[in-house]
């Protein structure tokens, strides 16, 4: 398991290829073109709507920053409207390919496995239009993409790097009321992708441990790469100007919840906590998603039941610029999720100098420095959340509030996309070095060359 850049491991020392051979192959690896796979949600979709969230931001921003290093990036995603053009040139060196696979509308994410063959065919056809060896590496995002990624890896003879973003077993262990468990099909599919991937990229050390304990991943194949934040967009700004733009009074205390409105994200916890704090206003920025679609007005109804409807402002999903303005305007951002592989919203808020109160789950203890840039809450007890929010609000006007605000911005600055891109490229080069060494081993061992590539090492997963 590696954090950021590092030397290649020694897994090849008994296979006819010396460790220093792998190190040399890694150092010599050249990344010219990358195929990014994002089957279930487009990087061009507005975060906070449907299935769009932090992963969308991650895929798009990593592609843009790789392109700034002179690397060509093609992102493959499923077309969801007949008006989607086959190819969208997002920026120099970055294009999105909208692959037609299944109906444009009305296809639930849980039905997408039925369309993976069609999606894979579209990906392979796109590559077939180029000269052999067009892509140097495949990077799949989420397990559905990983299923297509390992097929492309074998067809193109290039390494597969995979980022899970979330794991079914982790989500199922922390289900919120009203959320349906992830199906066994996904658990099996995730195990297959973990077994097949040449390298696995995770957001945090905690996620790496989960991959190892749940899916028996090889620690030597895991790279820890923290997501980045756009520090040009998310930076400290004028609070009063932002409040005027949003119609907020200069003196009122304001808490924000930003994200998809679904049980997993627990926006109801914030409303119930704020209901215990007289005079505190809450801004909810986001749209219903997942099981939240079953009751799109549920949060507004809850505000009515709690008697705080006049203190709740609902905003649609925000563009990055508008989201930064929301962060500038509020006193703190609340993130009470039951499960969160990282928590990009937490870092974006802190980059604006806004403190965060977050659940101590998943990657949030990495995204938020407890007692320094914000507060972490263990569990989802409403009284504890009310106390945590009240404590930060009371310190707002004093020296402690200003100190935490500066600390928040300083902490967020360590999560730049430049650092993320450096770590991604290091992982890509390791994957290419290991993959090349593996192919050389096959040439030296004719018996191994006749074996299926990875099937002999596969582990089954019970439902």
Swiss-Prot record:
InterPro entries: Glyco_trans_1, Glyco_trans_4-like_N, Mycothiol_biosynthesis_MshA. GO terms for biological process: mycothiol biosynthetic process. 1D-myo-inositol 3-phosphate binds at residues 40, 51-56, 109, 142, 166, 186. Residues 443-463 are annotated as: Disordered. It is an enzyme of class 2 (transferase). Its EC number is 2.4.1.250. It catalyses: 1D-myo-inositol 3-phosphate + UDP-N-acetyl-alpha-D-glucosamine = 1D-myo-inositol 2-acetamido-2-deoxy-alpha-D-glucopyranoside 3-phosphate + UDP + H(+). Homodimer. Catalyzes the transfer of a N-acetyl-glucosamine moiety to 1D-myo-inositol 3-phosphate to produce 1D-myo-inositol 2-acetamido-2-deoxy-glucopyranoside 3-phosphate in the mycothiol biosynthesis pathway. This is D-inositol 3-phosphate glycosyltransferase. It comes from Mycobacterium ulcerans (strain Agy99). The lineage of its organism: Bacteria, Bacillati, Actinomycetota, Actinomycetes, Mycobacteriales. The gene is mshA.
């Amino acid at each position: 398991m590696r954090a950021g850049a590092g030397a290649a491991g020694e897994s090849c020392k008994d296979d006819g290829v010396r460790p220093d051979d792998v190190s040399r192959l890694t150092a010599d690896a050249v990344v010219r073109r990358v195929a990014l796979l994002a089957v279930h949600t487009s990087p061009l979709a507005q975060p906070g709507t449907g299935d769009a969230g932090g992963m969308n931001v991650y895929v798009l921003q990593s592609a843009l920053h790789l392109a700034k290093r002179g690397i060509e990036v093609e992102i493959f995603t499923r077309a969801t409207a007949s008006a989607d053009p086959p190819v969208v040139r997002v920026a120099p060196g970055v294009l999105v390919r909208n692959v037609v696979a299944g109906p444009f509308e009305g296809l639930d994410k849980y039905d997408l496995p039925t369309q993976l063959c069609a999606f894979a065919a579209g990906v392979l056809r796109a590559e077939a239009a180029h000269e052999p060896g067009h892509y140097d590496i495949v990077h799949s995002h989420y397990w559905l993409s990983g299923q297509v990624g390992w097929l492309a890896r074998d067809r193109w003879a290039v390494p597969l790097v995979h980022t899970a973003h979330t794991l079914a077993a982790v989500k199922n262990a922390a289900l919120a009321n009203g959320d349906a468990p992830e199906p066994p099909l996904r658990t099996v599919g995730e195990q297959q992708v973990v077994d097949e991937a040449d390298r696995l990229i995770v957001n945090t050390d905690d996620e790496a441990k989960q991959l190892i304990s749940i899916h028996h991943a090889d620690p030597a194949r895991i790279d820890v790469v923290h997501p980045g934040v756009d520090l040009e967009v998310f930076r400290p700004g004028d609070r009063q100007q932002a409040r005027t733009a949003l119609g907020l009074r200069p003196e009122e205390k304001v808490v924000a919840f930003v994200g998809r409105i679904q049980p997993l994200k627990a926006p109801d916890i914030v409303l119930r906590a704020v209901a215990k704090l007289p005079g505190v206003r809450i801004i909810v920025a986001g749209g219903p998603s997942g099981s939240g679609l079953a009751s799109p007005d549920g949060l507004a109804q809850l505000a009515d039941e709690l008697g705080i409807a006049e203190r709740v402002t609902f905003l649609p999903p925000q563009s990055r610029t508008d989201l930064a303005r929301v962060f500038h305007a509020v006193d703190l951002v609340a993130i009470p999720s039951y499960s969160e592989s990282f928590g990009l919203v937490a870092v974006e808020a802190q980059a604006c100098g806004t403190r965060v109160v977050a659940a101590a789950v998943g990657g949030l203890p990495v995204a938020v420095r407890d007692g320094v840039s914000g507060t972490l809450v263990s569990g989802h007890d409403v009284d504890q959340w009310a106390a945590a929010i009240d404590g930060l609000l009371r310190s707002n006007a004093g020296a402690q509030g200003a100190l935490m605000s500066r600390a928040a911005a300083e902490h967020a600055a360590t999560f730049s996309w430049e650092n993320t891109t450096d770590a991604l490229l290091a992982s890509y080069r390791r994957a290419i070095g290991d993959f090349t060494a593996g192919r050389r081993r096959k040439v030296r061992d004719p018996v191994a060359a006749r074996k299926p590539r990875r099937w002999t090492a596969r582990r089954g997963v019970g439902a």
